[in-house]
């Protein structure tokens, strides 16, 4: 199982070959319901926007819901991050907690999660490439 950040899903949908090559052999794919929102937030406001139709473009990625146990884990991760001087956004703390709960690789395509407190407790792979 591979847990995908919204940045990774977006790059996959943009046909980023580095992301496609890395992910295609690492299914099943999971993400957070928060990441689903982040991906859908991009096209929101465009003509004829339909969130259900947009969600189908990445229907192969199953979403895990955020719950109280994950809220506690997000708080622990945020505490460690603040103490390290690398505070996460609220959403990123919630997403990181969800990823951590799976025990699997967390694949991102930006530098938001390259912090020691996160990398100490989970495997974070960054596929970010300069275009």
Regions found by a protein language model. Name each.
Residues 6, 68, 90-93:
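Conserved glycosyltransferase catalytic-site signature
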Residues 3-4, 22-47, 62-69:
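PIN/NYN-family metal-dependent endoribonuclease catalytic core
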Residues 36, 71-74, 92:
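A general structural signal for well-ordered alpha-helical segments in protein cores
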Residues 60-82:
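Acidic catalytic patch
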Residues 1, 100-131:
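Acidic, PIN/NYN-like endoribonuclease modules and their adjacent C-terminal/linker elements
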Residues 39, 89-105:
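Acidic, metal-associated active-site segment
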Residues 1-16, 31:
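Metal-dependent nucleic-acid phosphoesterase active-site entry motif
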Residues 9-15, 35-53, 76-83:
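A short secondary-structure junction motif
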């Amino acid at each position: 199982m591979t847990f995908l950040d919204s940045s990774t899903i977006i790059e996959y949908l943009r046909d980023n070959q580095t992301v496609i090559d890395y992910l295609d052999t690492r299914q099943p794919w999971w993400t957070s319901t928060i990441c689903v929102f982040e991906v859908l937030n991009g096209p929101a406001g465009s003509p004829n926007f339909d969130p259900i139709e947009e969600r189908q473009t990445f229907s192969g990625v199953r979403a895990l819901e955020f719950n109280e146990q994950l809220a506690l884990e997000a708080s622990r991760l945020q505490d460690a991050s603040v103490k390290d001087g690398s505070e996460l956004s609220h959403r990123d703390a919630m997403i990181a907690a969800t990823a951590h709960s799976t025990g699997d690789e967390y694949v991102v395509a930006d530098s938001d999660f390259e912090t020691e407190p996160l990398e100490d407790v989970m495997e974070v792979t960054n596929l970010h490439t300069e275009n």
